[in-house]
Design a protein with these regions (language model features):
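Gram-negative bacterial Sec-dependent N-terminal signal peptides
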Residues: 1-18
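N-terminal pro-sequences and low-complexity stem/linker regions of secreted or lumenal proteins
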Residues: 21-333
Length: 333
């Protein structure tokens, strides 16, 4: 899951149209008021859009003009020169892609997805570019040389959009700090990245109070899995087990007396990973506090109502519904 994470407040979208309004909101005194004045943190994670895919052409960021990107030992060129050949894979099926570059073309550079014009500006925002699973992403990573994105995860994986295609995201990026050195927690799919988001790790941390080996505690979480049980390596070793049993960030917040809640609709695209933890499953059976705060469905409207009425907890997590997740084929917001 290549993701975009935005840390902001509920009023950002409304204020983004006016730079002066934004400046008054987050810095009302004209100086840095300090962390002690931050009363609410809102965490919002979206799906499957890379930084360069959105902001590679943005001025002032480490995008496509970055002179310090890695030079592959295999090509002796920087990673913006991606090799192509007749051996390209379909990232979803791991089968030959079925179409090939023109004769004598052996590399592909980042390109504007809607280069054909017309309705392609809308159509390409819905396009799927390979997959984000562990195997395909690490094949593209190629032991750190990062020179097999087009080969192992389709040529679409290095395409980008322009500001005109995603004006809301650009308004946010221009008004606030943009994380051009922000990376996903793990080069893999949704579940492990969201597990890391809610717990700080994809594997039981050292010193966990849960008895047993890693397979009993659930880790390491390397790919998506919804049902109880484990995936297995070729040698039979377990990974991506469900349920998980180590401690989550919300539990630490609660112990520290910090209020928190997950805001989501029943359509949450399966993106609330707290349901994977045993303690939340147990809490749900007992109608306990962990489940009420973390795995229930208060609805996104509840977030807007609480923001309006000054009732937000100190830490809010937002999980978007499927069609607003930005996960291809669903469009950017």
């Amino acid at each position: 899951m290549v993701q975009v994470t935005t840390l902001a407040a509920a009023v950002v979208l409304g204020a983004a149209a006016s730079t002066s309004a934004v400046e008054r909101w987050y810095n009302p005194h004209g100086v840095n008021p300090g962390l002690k004045n931050i009363q609410h943190v809102v965490l919002f994670m979206q799906e499957n859009r890379a930084f360069d895919h959105y902001f590679g052409t943005m001025a002032g960021v480490r995008g496509f003009q970055d002179p310090n990107v890695h030079v592959s030992k295999n090509t002796n060129k920087d990673v913006f020169h991606q090799p192509v050949s007749r051996n390209m894979w379909n990232g979803d099926t791991l089968q030959p892609l079925g179409y090939f570059p023109p004769k004598d073309v052996n590399e592909l550079k980042p390109y504007y997805l809607a280069w054909q014009g017309g309705d392609w500006a809308n159509r390409t925002q819905c396009m799927v570019a390979g997959t984000n699973d562990w195997r395909q992403n690490h094949a593209a990573y190629n032991r750190g040389e990062m020179d097999k994105w087009a080969m192992a995860n389709t040529p679409y994986s290095i395409g980008y959009v322009h500001e005109a295609d995603i004006p809301v995201q650009y308004k946010l990026a221009e008004a606030f700090t943009v994380g051009d050195m922000y990376y996903e927690s793990i080069m893999s799919s949704t579940a492990p990245n969201r597990v890391s988001w809610f717990s700080g790790t994809i594997n039981p941390p050292k010193g966990s109070k849960v008895n047993g080996t890693n397979k009993h505690m659930g880790g390491p979480t390397l790919d998506n899995r919804d049902s109880v049980g484990c995936e297995r390596t070729d040698s039979g070793k377990p990974f991506s087990c469900v349920p998980l049993r180590w401690k989550t960030v919300p539990e630490y917040l609660q112990e520290a007396g910090i209020s928190w809640r997950v805001y989501q609709d029943k359509d949450n695209f399966g993106d609330d990973p707290l349901v994977m933890w045993k303690q939340y499953q147990t809490s749900a059976k007992k109608k306990g506090d962990l489940a009420q705060r973390g795995t229930s469905f208060p609805g996104l409207q509840k977030f807007f109502d609480d923001a309006r009425d000054g009732k937000l907890p100190e830490v809010s997590y937002i999980v978007a519904p499927m069609q607003l997740s930005e996960h291809p084929p669903y469009m950017p917001m």
